[in-house]
Regions:
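Short glycine/serine/threonine/alanine-rich loop segments
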Residues: 31-32, 84, 108, 136
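A short acidic, glycine-rich active-site loop
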Residues: 54-70
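Structural beta-alpha unit
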Residues: 51, 74-111
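Short secondary-structure boundary segments
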Residues: 37, 115-116, 142-143
Length: 144
């Protein structure tokens, strides 16, 4: 039985597909959904400018918590509009470590993430690491 679905998001198009999949899954099982994100505090505005030009999978490195808040809020609102019990959490750190840690913290039964990586031909490093270290089942959504 699935009671809690966790999903990693950063607001990217790839993450949006994983979020939609996770919302559908939570709705089907009448489960709670937790939207998770990782960020690294930006030390100056030049890093924020650089983040706009960076590939999606590394943009988190230039973000701060304020940058991930809209993605989490939008996802939470979408879930609540469909009648789901939804919460969010963001934490500073490397995405795969943060997702694994927070999935465990929230006692997730399943963790949903997108498949897109830096090299568009192979599974991304975050989903690859998460699939090996997560404390729960992992669903990797094909987004490309």
């Amino acid at each position: 039985m699935i009671k809690t679905v966790a999903v990693g998001t950063d607001g990217s198009d790839t993450a949006a597909k994983a979020v939609e999949f996770a919302i559908d899954l939570a709705e089907r099982y009448e489960a709670k959904i937790v939207f998770l994100s990782a960020y690294k505090a930006a030390s100056d505005s030049s890093q924020k400018r650089e983040s706009r030009d960076a590939p999606e999978d590394v943009q988190w490195q230039f973000s701060n918590s304020e940058d991930v808040d809209p993605a989490l809020s939008d996802a939470e609102e979408s879930a609540k509009e469909r009648g789901l019990d939804a919460t969010t959490e963001a934490k500073e750190g490397e995405p795969s470590k943060v997702l694994v840690e927070l999935a465990g913290k929230h006692n997730a039964d399943v963790l949903v993430i997108g498949n897109k990586g830096m090299d568009r031909k192979v599974l991304g490093s975050v989903p690859n690491t998460v699939s090996h270290k997560a404390p729960c089942s992992v669903v990797i959504v094909k987004t490309t």
